[in-house]
């Protein structure tokens, strides 16, 4: 076939296509956001969601069962061990030792609980909050959408007289939904140069301790700090051994949160908060003197970094609580002398 014949069979060119329609979401912004900045703000938003969900859950549970919780605290403090168990169970239910401590201090001011019984409840509350770390470490965060769906639908379409019970279920699921979002953003965020540089500042136990205590005082919740620490370790952002000091600092910061909370209450509440802060300091001394040498054997018991943090967190709180409960009959009179009744 010659060239003239081949030209007769040439395919015509495609007509020009009209420009594609752009939505408002495709319009470039004037601020050039990088993927690292997007991840950072997503992580901050998830942390804020976690913090508010935790507080809302504690508020909903307290509003629904506050009177029952008060009766439970009043009846189940026959001895120091029963009081500690009561505090642990109460804090595990409401996911906040601060809420249990505040209710306990209020009951003591009203002469419903003795100051000694109230302190045993506060000792146990420190142990009860360790449940949060175990739930996160065991990846219960995947159940968040289920609880959010069930609680949300129940509060909207359930029987009218029972709809309020859907609110705490909704917020409980929202806690784990936020944790799941945090987990999904921390892993890629841990690879950015800015975060790697920041993580390098937590290179010593003292810095990690101060960071944990300061962050707890800022957000007013050790559960938030411990939960974030478990996720950070699982995502490779913090080394497991350094994360232990962040958790110890979070426990130390809880005592100072109780001190600030008690400033609006009477002298009995201030004495209790001082006792609680002293317990955290004694726990820190015990950890520095004894428990830090057992970190490596404890970490070896668990295969995953998140479970390792949860185990050491529980060991720290259980050791401090056991020490306080066993020595309570002998040290109580000295505590009352050391912190006078009209302490400011």
What do these predicted regions represent?
Residues 179, 186-201, 265-344:
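Transmembrane alpha-helical segments and their short flanking loops
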Residues 42-55, 87, 91, 148-157, ...:
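Hydrophobic core segments of alpha-helical transmembrane domains in multi-pass membrane transport
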Residues 67, 71, 75, 79, ...:
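Alpha-helical transmembrane segments of multi-pass membrane proteins, especially transporters
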Residues 31-80, 169-210, 214, 232:
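Helix-loop-helix hairpins and the membrane-proximal interhelical loops
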Residues 59-62, 98-102, 129-136, 148-149, ...:
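Alpha-helical transmembrane segments and their lipid-water interface positions
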Residues 91-94, 99-126, 136-143, 153-155, ...:
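Membrane-interfacial helix-loop connectors
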Residues 52, 56-64, 68, 72, ...:
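Membrane-spanning helices that line or support transport/gating and their immediate boundary helices
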Residues 24-27, 33:
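Short, positively charged and aromatic/hydrophobic N-terminal segments
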């Amino acid at each position: 076939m010659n060239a003239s014949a081949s030209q007769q069979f040439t395919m015509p060119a495609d007509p020009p296509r009209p420009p594609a329609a752009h939505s408002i979401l495709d319009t470039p912004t004037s601020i050039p956001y990088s993927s690292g900045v997007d991840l950072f703000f997503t992580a901050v938003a998830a942390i804020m969601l976690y913090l508010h969900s935790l507080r809302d859950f504690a508020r909903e549970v307290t509003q629904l069962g506050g009177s029952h919780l008060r009766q439970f605290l009043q009846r189940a403090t026959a001895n120091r061990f029963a009081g500690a168990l009561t505090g642990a169970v109460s804090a595990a239910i409401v996911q906040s030792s601060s809420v249990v401590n505040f209710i306990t201090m209020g009951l003591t001011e009203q002469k419903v609980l003795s100051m000694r019984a109230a302190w045993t409840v506060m000792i146990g509350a420190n142990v009860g909050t360790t449940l949060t770390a175990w739930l996160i470490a065991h990846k219960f965060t995947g159940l968040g959408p289920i609880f959010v769906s069930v609680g949300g639908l129940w509060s909207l379409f359930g029987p009218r007289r029972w709809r309020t019970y859907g609110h705490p279920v909704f917020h409980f699921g929202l806690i784990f939904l936020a944790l799941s979002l945090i987990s999904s953003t921390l892993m890629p965020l841990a690879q950015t140069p800015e975060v790697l540089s920041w993580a390098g500042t937590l290179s010593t136990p003292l810095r990690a301790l101060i960071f944990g205590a300061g962050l707890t005082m800022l957000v007013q919740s050790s559960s938030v700090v411990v939960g974030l620490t478990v996720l950070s370790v699982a995502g490779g952002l913090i080394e497991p051994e350094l994360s232990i000091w962040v958790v110890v600092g979070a426990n130390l910061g809880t005592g100072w949160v109780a001190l600030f909370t008690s400033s609006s209450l009477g002298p009995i509440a201030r004495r209790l908060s001082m006792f609680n802060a002293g317990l955290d300091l004694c726990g820190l001394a015990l950890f520095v003197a004894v428990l830090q040498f057992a970190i490596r054997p404890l970490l070896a018991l668990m295969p995953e970094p998140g479970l390792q943090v949860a185990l050491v967190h529980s060991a720290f709180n259980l050791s401090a609580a056991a020490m306080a409960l066993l020595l309570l009959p002998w040290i109580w009179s000295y505590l009352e002398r050391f912190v006078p009744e009209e302490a400011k």
